[in-house]
C-alpha cells in the first residue's frame, strides 16, 4: 500500500513548472569550443591559393571544351563508350576508354582489344592507389566545389617546389553537364606555372607542349610515390599459336570425344561409372556414399551408374535421360566422355551427344534374350549404330557387357560378334575400325586392365576397354576454319552476363572476342571461357567449353544456336537442299511429308517440299528425276523447309556441321548432308 500512497500523494505541479524546451537541443544553449570548431568546421580562409587554383582549373577546362571534338565525333565517342561499358562494366575508368577510342579512331573492336590486353582491373587498382598516394600532400579541395568536380580532370600527381608547381592529369572522357562537350584536352595551368602532362598518348589539338623541368623541381621521389608506367601487353591475340598451345596444355596428349551408346539397360552407365572409379576419378568416400544410398533405394546394382546419372529422376527411374559428361585420361589421350540415354523416348538427346563425338563405344547385353531384344526390330542397338555412323563416327568399340552372367562363354561372345559385325558392316563401318571386347561393368573385369579370370583368358587375348579407347585415332581438328560453336545448354550464372555450353566444331575463341549468334543475329562478347571446370584464356576445335557472354539478352539464345565470328558468319535459312539416305521405313516418303529435323543440338519441325531426283548410291548419278515417292534404301536429292530459321553449313565446307537426321513417328527415317542453302 505504500506504493499507492506515493502515487496518490505525488505533486504533479512541479513537473509542469519548466518551460517547454524539448524542441531544441541542449547544446544550442552553449557555445562551441575553439578546439572543436577547428577540428570539425571547414574554413575557406585557410586555403586561398587552392581556391584560386581550382577556379583557374575550372575556367581553363571550360574554355577548352569547345575546341576538341565536333558534335559528330562527340556522338561517336559517347556511342563507343556506351558499347565498351556494356562489355567492361565499371572496372575501367573512362579516361582509359576515351584514350583507347581516340587512339584507334573510334574503332570499338580495336579499342576494346587494347584495354582487355592490358592487365585490366589489377593494373587500374594500382594506378588508383598510387594516384591517391600522390594526392595526399596536396590540400583538400573545398566542399562547395565537389558538386562540380565531375568536369574536372583527375589529379594523377602533384609535386610542389618553391613557387612553381608540377601537375599531371589523366584526362577523363566524361561529358560535361553544362554544354554537352567532352573534356579531352590536356590541362593548361594558370599563367606563370609550369605544367607537365602525365597522361601518355594524348593527342595535341592546338595546345602548346609542356616545358621541361629541371631535376631539382621533381620531388615525387621524396613523397615516396612514382608515376605508374604503362604496361605493355605480352603478345597480341592475333598471334596465338593454337596448335602449340594445345600440345602444351594437354601435356602432349590428344583430345578425344567419346560417346557411349546402346540399348536401354545394357549397362552403359554402370560400365563407364566403374571405369571412372577404377581410374581414380571418383574417390572412395563418394563411391561408398553411392553404395549406401542405392541400397536404401533398393537399387544396389545401380551404385556405379549413379556416378554419371546425377539427377534424382534418373536415379529413381534407373534410366539415363540426358547426356552425362565427364573427363578422364588414358596414356596418350584426354577423353571427354558422354553417356547417352538408351531409351527410345530420349533418342533426341542421344543424337545431341552423338553429334558431338569423335568415336563411340556400343554396349550390348550378353544375357540370353536381352541381346536379341535390343538387336531385333524395335531395339535401340540397330538404331544407335546407324545414327552414330550417319553422324560421322567411323571408329567403334563394341563392349559385350554382362559376360559374367553367361560364365564368359566363348560361344556366346562369337554369336554376338557375328550378328553385330555383319550389321555394322552394312551400316558403313570398316572391319578394321570395329573392335569387340568382353566386359563386366558390375565386377569391373577387363575394363582398365586385362582380366585375370581364367574363364576369359583361356580364349581372349585382346585389349581391355581402356586400352582400346587409348588406341583410337583422333580426327583432324578444323582449327584453321572460322569459329563455330553449337549451343547445348544455356543458363544464368552468378555475376554479369550468362553462360552457354557446347562443343567448338571449328576455329578457336579467346576471351574478349566478339561473337555473333545465329539465327538470332545478335552480337556479344566472350567475357570468360571455362574448360573442364577450369578458367582458360582460349579454347579450340574439339573442346567442350562454357562461355560467359555479355552484351546480349539471354532470352534471345536457345539450345541449337550457333556462335560464330562476325566477319565470317554462318548462314541461317528456312529452305535448303540435301542428299538423304532412306532407312527402313513403313510408309514411303512423298512431297509434303512432315519430319523432325535433328541437326547438332537443334530439333526443328520440317516438311519435304520437293523430291528432286533419285541418285545412285555409289556414283551419285541421277537415275530418276522428280520421283513421286521414296522408299527404303534409296538415295535421293530433296528440298526441305523448316518452320523457323536454322543455322546450317554445307557438307563440302564443314563436314561436322553438314550432317543431319530426319525422324518421324518416334523412329529415324533418313540421314542426310546439306548440299545447297536456298534462303
Swiss-Prot record:
PROSITE patterns: G_TR_2 (PS51722)
Modified residues (Phosphoserine): 63, 113, 145, 147
Organism: Rattus norvegicus
Lineage of source species: Eukaryota, Metazoa, Chordata, Craniata, Vertebrata
Chain spans, region G4: 401-404
GO CC field: cytosolic ribosome; Dom34-Hbs1 complex
Family classification: Belongs to the TRAFAC class translation factor GTPase superfamily. Classic translation factor GTPase family.
Protein name, as recorded: HBS1-like protein
Keyword Transferase in annotation: no
Residue ranges occupied by any tr-type G domain in the UniProt entry: 253-477
Gene: Hbs1l
UniProt superkingdom: Eukaryota
G5: annotated segments: 440-442
Catalytic activity, EC: 3.6.5.-
